[in-house]
Amino acid sequence: MIISISLNAALSSERTFSMSVGDEVKFNENTIEFAKISLQKSSNFESLSADFIFSNGDDTFELYPEKRKYFVRGEITTESDISIKPIKDIYITIGEQQSNGKWIVNLQENYFVRLIWISAIIMSLGAVLVIRRRIYV
């Protein structure tokens, strides 16, 4: 677990950008395009849903982060979207709109997240085995 957490801390990165619809930025090996933003309504909230297109050579995918406003409490939440890959996860969130019309966009690349979870599961199974063994001794 220590190795996976150390690798995650050493390799992960985070950047914040100010973007308008149509803007493109480079983040590590990815090119990210802010394709569009749209208003969507649900039964108990309305959301601003953004569409970001990630491209890296042959690999192209889209992520859709949201800002939601719930009708009952008037509460505003930020819903991130995550691209899950075997070695790394890419998180994207959309923040507030600035006075110049641009949006704050936060990008994170986290490595070896699944390895951290697998390590925790192995440790838990080890603890269960130790407890079971003591009961039957």
Question: Whereabouts are the PLM-identified features?
Answer:
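Solvent-exposed, non-transmembrane regions of integral membrane proteins
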Residues: 1-137
